[in-house]
Amino acid sequence: MARRDVLLPFLLLLATVSAVAFAEDDPDCVYTFYLRTGSIWKAGTDSIISARIYDKDGDYIGIKNLQAWAGLMGPDYNYFERGNLDIFSGRAPCLPSPICALNLTSDGSGDHHGWYVNYVEITTAGVHAQCSTQDFEIEQWLATDTSPYELTAVRNNCPVKLRDSVSRVGSEIRKKLSWVV
């Protein structure tokens, strides 16, 4: 009987410690991207699209291939086509503060490398993180044959310029890097 009195509280303590430890090992957030491709003729692309999302301190999450990381539209769906609203939702480490900047990049591959992007909306949700939504108006071609002749669009809605929050200007922005895919 005495063993049972000691064993039961010990097992409860062990279960509680394990639950807390496992909860802290899973700090991931869910990031959902809504990307609207323009309805302009030839606005769609077959290129691989990557993104980096930044918080106000310059910490960021990098996603090498949005479609491979978290495409929700199904296996036969053709992403980034004219007029489409494409949705991607996946897990990645939580950033310390809400997203406020975006680097959206096309690799320029495929038969149709040019891509006209209307906007990107990103929502963030996490167990111990503040839920947030950030809208980025792009209204730009990501192409080498159309103005502005860039495969990257950068939008910064941060209250402080990212450059002011980091010590190394022009290089990788800060210390926290996580390439998801």
From Swiss-Prot:
Compartmental location: Endoplasmic reticulum; Plastid, Chloroplast, Plastoglobule
What is one GO cellular-component annotation here? plastoglobule
Instruction: State the Gene Ontology BP annotations.
Output: response to cold; response to salt stress; response to water deprivation
**Tissue-by-tissue expression:** Expressed in root tips, pericycle cells, lateral root primordia, stomata, leaf vasculature, hydathodes and floral organs.
Q: Where is the signal peptide?
A: 1-14
Q: Which CDD domains match?
A: PLAT_plant_stress
Q: If researchers knock out this gene, what phenotype do they report?
A: No visible phenotype under normal growth conditions, but mutant plant have enhanced sensitivity to salt, drought and cold stresses.
Xref: PROSITE patterns:
PLAT
Q: What is this protein called?
A: PLAT domain-containing protein 1
